[in-house]
Amino acid sequence: MNSEKEDEPLEEIGDSNNVLDLTSYQLHSLDTVELPPNLIELDLTANRLSGLDSRIAQLSTLKKLSLRQNLIDDSAVEPLSHWDALSDLEELVLRDNKLAKVPDVSIFTKLLVYDISFNEITSLEGISKASSTLKELYVSKNEVNKIMEIEHLHNLQILELGSNRLRVMENLENFTKLEELWLGRNRIKVVNLCGLKCIKKISLQSNRLTSMKGFEECVALEELYLSHNGISKMEGLSALVNLRVLDVSNNKLTSVDDIQNLTKLEDLWLNDNQIESLEAITEAVTGSKEKLTTIYLENNPCAKSSDYVAAVRQIFPNVEQIDSNLFA
């Protein structure tokens, strides 16, 4: 089905003279589009482009370029590496295309955001050419099997490598500014965070973890997502006093442990485990009893009784959600 936008006059598109948004115009090329020379942002998301218009090479003021959700392959993106006029580019989005390798972005010496997620990339080889100015790197939903060539990216704040084929957490030592690490849907068995003390959000959902050990030094951690693993014991959490969200659903837990000190905990996901006792949960969450607003416990033995929801509401006076039940 064609987008209604196809019928709109292209010369009227855009928010201003320096922002051009051509999202979802089903364009096969930019032949009918005027590209103002002073563009700062060019958004070509959700079109049918299989190549790059050579006029983009002259946009010397461009800061943001999005080619998300097109048909760009390795040969089509190659000219970018020679377009020196674009050296001030700060954000490059190549998400959801047909890339098989990491493009050469070495000329973008001020790059802050780089997104190559949802492609067919098998290796991070070539990422070493990316500028050390980079703050956000997104490589999710590819086929990468090793964390490599990223040690120089010491300004990284967000690293997204979810839905790949990673087995080992490695080469993270230099990321002293990293705040978010997303590694869900990989094949990781052991947590190795190399003492990332500034990190605030970690996702290791849907991996092969059997232990929670490895987070002890991440004292700034606020959100921890560990669902769909094989964890049988809650441990190594007592020092994580800033934790607000803890998701350990869909594991092999029989009890709730090591969270008594977590006075800031607001969201606790324990559903789909083997937890027997509500009384034990009461004792385990003493520190956050007043703070907790959301708790998931369904599909545990302790959630089978008919008065289970009422009992949980008594334990947590300020709770707003129990499983799918919302309370005003």
UniProtKB/Swiss-Prot annotation:
SMART domains: LRR_SD22, LRR_TYP. One of its GO terms (cellular component) is nucleus. Keywords: Leucine-rich repeat, Protein phosphatase inhibitor, Repeat. It comes from Arabidopsis thaliana (Mouse-ear cress). Inhibitor of protein-phosphatase 1 (PP1). Binds to and inhibits PP1 activity. PANTHER family: NISCHARIN RELATED (PTHR15454), PROTEIN PHOSPHATASE 1 REGULATORY SUBUNIT 7-RELATED (PTHR15454:SF56). LRR repeats lie at residues 13-36, 37-59, 61-82, 86-110, 111-130, 131-153, 154-177, 179-196, 197-221, 223-240, 241-264, 266-287, 289-312. The keyword Repeat applies. One of its GO terms (biological process) is abscisic acid-activated signaling pathway. This is Protein phosphatase 1 regulatory inhibitor subunit PPP1R7 homolog. PROSITE patterns: LRR. InterPro entries: Leu-rich_rpt, Leu-rich_rpt_4, Leu-rich_rpt_typical-subtyp, LRR_dom_sf. The keyword Repeat applies. Interacts with human protein phosphatase PPP1C. It holds the Pfam family LRR_4. One of its GO terms (molecular function) is protein phosphatase inhibitor activity.
